[in-house]
Regions:
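A charged, amphipathic interaction segment
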Residues: 174-230
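Short internal beta-strands
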Residues: 53-55, 131-137, 189-192
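Core SAM-dependent methyltransferase catalytic element
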Residues: 87-95
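A glycine-rich helix N-cap at a beta->alpha junction
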Residues: 72-80, 151-182
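Short, glycine-rich nucleotide/cofactor-binding loops
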Residues: 25-32, 103-115
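Ordered, small/hydrophobic-rich secondary-structure cores
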Residues: 1-85
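Positively charged, small/polar-rich N-terminal and surface patches that mediate targeting and assembly
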Residues: 130, 137-138, 142-144, 148-161, ...
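Histidine-anchored nucleotide/phosphate-binding helix
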Residues: 38-39, 115-127
Length: 231
């Protein structure tokens, strides 16, 4: 009989063969947040090691975790429901090479307008696809040190309230998502003329390894990509 024992308060479970990392992700409904935490935990594991993720029992989360498992090859060896929560046991598999590439163009720096393009980019990167993002127009401000996403229009002064609500469910700030993307190997590009127009100083970027260019440089990325995203 397998005997499990909690060995500390930070989420590790021990049996007679080693440890299993446990991630309590209840309250988070954004699957890119959930899967980035799972990805990070698996990165420290050997092939065959397991990570346990506890989430809310939400259909969208369940479908996305199964899609991620099919794409990456990491196995969902056990899924069980317990009231309002669902427990996923994930076994790390050998890395699965992806032939897909996403090239995305982002033109808007609004709080809600950034959610979808960054979400799809993160989803692609978490599935192991090559990701390149080009920021143009007002979106170049997203790359500047100190940027905080705000709503457009009359709601702009009250942006803190939806921003806090989004963060609570897993929509972390845009710059944090970009750091996750770079951690996953994504490449960032910025439109040089837009940076000049919106007074974004290249010396004041919040990210390293940003390629400052214009249309033709990013056309190289788009021509080799099979997934295109324009937002």
């Amino acid at each position: 009989m397998m005997v499990w024992e909690f060995i500390d308060d930070v989420g590790e479970l021990m049996n007679d063969t080693g440890t299993r990392t446990i991630l309590d992700l209840t309250g988070k409904t954004i699957t890119t947040y959930i899967l980035f935490e799972v990805h990070d935990a698996l990165a420290d594991c050997c092939e065959g090691d397991r990570v346990e993720a506890i989430t809310d029992a939400v259909t969208a989360i369940d479908n996305d975790l199964h899609a991620w498992s099919r794409t990456t090859g990491n196995s969902l060896v056990e899924v069980s429901e317990h009231g309002t929560t669902r427990r996923y046991v994930i076994a790390k598999s050998a890395p699965k090479h992806s032939e897909h590439k996403l090239a995305g163009i982002i033109s808007d720096d609004g709080l809600f307008e950034l959610l979808s393009p960054l979400g799809f980019a993160l989803g692609a990167a978490l599935e192991g696809h090559d990701v390149s993002l080009y920021f143009q127009g007002p979106a170049v401000r997203v790359l500047a040190t100190g940027f905080r996403a705000r709503m457009h229009g009359l709601g702009r002064p009250f942006s803190r309230f939806p921003r806090d609500g989004l963060a609570k469910v897993g929509h972390i700030p845009p710059q944090d998502k970009l750091r996750q993307l770079q951690h996953l190997g994504a490449s960032l590009f910025a439109c040089g003329p837009s940076m000049e127009h919106y007074k974004v100083d290249p010396a004041n970027l919040a990210f390293s390894n940003v390629t400052i260019a214009a249309y033709l440089t990013f056309m190289e990325q788009m021509s080799s990509a099979d997934i295109h995203l324009v937002a």
